[in-house]
Amino acid sequence: MKLMCMMIVAVLFLTAWTFVTADDSINGPENRRIWEKLLSKTRDEMKNPEASKLNKKECRQPGEFCFPVVAKCCGGTCLVICI
């Protein structure tokens, strides 16, 4: 019984190892390069938050249309038009 359990565990381990180390032939090397490029870009943005475009919030200039809750005015006051 112990030998049978050890054999089952060994087969499961080797099967898992095969799946983990297998080459992903469907996505090919060109797709891997794309993912590596995207991941390196996100790592750079994490190290330097100013590099992220999402952190840049624009403010509206005086005289431009704004919505009081959503838009931010550079001058600070939004009453449908930035003051």
Swiss-Prot record:
Expressed by the venom duct. Residues 1-22 form the signal peptide. GO terms for molecular function: ion channel inhibitor activity; toxin activity. The keyword Lipoprotein does not apply. Keywords: Cleavage on pair of basic residues, Disulfide bond, Knottin, Neurotoxin, Secreted, Signal, Toxin. GO terms for cellular component: extracellular region. This is Conotoxin VnMKLT1-022. It comes from Conus ventricosus. The lineage of its organism: Eukaryota, Metazoa, Spiralia, Lophotrochozoa, Mollusca.
